[in-house]
């Protein structure tokens, strides 16, 4: 009887919730690079913590977001040299992967990519048993940042929408921003509160806003908030790779 193979591909962000031990580790997960010079290269390391060899391949994609924070990706192999692009990592061993940016050097704003390490499934022994083979993909984030680039987050509007508030933000700067550690101060007649930490991150979802990008964040309207005249002040707390 032929072995029936089921594949389950899990992104790294879901592993903790799946209750499955990591087959391997990738570091770093987020890093900044320059468009040219020595800083246009970086190294990520793939550590095989499994008891068996793993086969990997590395893929580059451009990362984009719409105003709701929904992510999309575009192939970007022409913007990078990845070495080695494929490989076998033995148990307990670490494979270094060099990332060389070779895209446009004259950037007027930062560009964000994912460099994804994909585990390639292998054939299971033909022992007559069925099973599930889990393969893990780790998407690291590579930001190509021109010299002197800065994020500038502006509050465009705060609009009541039933029991919610629609907060519209715009990045008027020329560098990406990660909004995860930031907060929003709401104030009105006889009322003030700060939305931060888990409440903010839950409403935010995807935390990235790219240069020139707009984000619309739906906030739960506080019970004691006035019906009119509510003002929002966004406080950017930047994270460092």
Please annotate each region the language model reported.
Residues 1-10:
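Bacterial N-terminal signal peptides that target proteins for export
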Residues 16-21:
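N-terminal signal peptide c-region/cleavage motif recognized by signal peptidases
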Residues 23-50, 86, 148-164, 168-170, ...:
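Beta-sheet-dominated interaction scaffolds and their linkers
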Residues 51-74, 174-193, 236-238:
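Short acidic, flexible loop segments centered on an aromatic residue
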Residues 61-63, 94, 100-104, 118-120, ...:
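Solvent-exposed coil/turn segments that connect beta secondary-structure elements
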Residues 71-105, 193-225:
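Intrinsically disordered, low-complexity Pro/Gly/Ser/Thr-rich segments with frequent PxxP/GP/PP motifs
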Residues 102-152, 223-241:
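Terminal connector regions
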Residues 121-194:
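A charged, solvent-exposed segment within the mature domains of Sec-exported extracytoplasmic proteins
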């Amino acid at each position: 009887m032929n072995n029936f193979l089921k594949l389950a591909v899990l992104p790294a962000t879901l592993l903790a919730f799946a209750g499955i031990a990591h087959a391997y580790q990738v570091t770093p997960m987020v890093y900044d690079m320059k468009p040219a010079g020595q800083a246009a290269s970086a190294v990520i390391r793939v550590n095989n913590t499994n008891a068996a060899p793993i086969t990997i391949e590395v893929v580059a994609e451009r990362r984009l977001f719409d105003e709701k924070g929904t992510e999309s990706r575009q192939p970007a192999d022409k913007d990078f040299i990845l070495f080695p692009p494929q490989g076998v990592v033995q148990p307990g061993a670490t494979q270094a992967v060099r990332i060389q940016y070779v895209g446009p050097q004259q950037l007027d704003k930062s560009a964000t990519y994912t460099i994804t390490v994909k585990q390639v499934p292998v054939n299971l022994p033909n022992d007559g048993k069925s099973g599930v083979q889990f393969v893990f993909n780790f998407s690291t984030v590579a930001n190509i940042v021109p010299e002197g680039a800065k994020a500038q987050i502006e509050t465009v509007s705060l609009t009541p929408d039933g029991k919610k508030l629609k907060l519209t933000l715009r990045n008027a700067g020329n560098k990406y921003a990660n909004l995860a550690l930031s907060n929003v101060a709401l104030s009105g007649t006889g009322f003030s509160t700060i939305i931060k930490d888990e409440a903010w991150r839950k409403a935010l979802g995807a935390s990235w806003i790219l240069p020139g990008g707009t984000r619309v964040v739906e906030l739960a309207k506080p019970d004691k908030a006035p019906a009119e005249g509510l003002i929002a002040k966004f406080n950017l707390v930047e994270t460092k790779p």
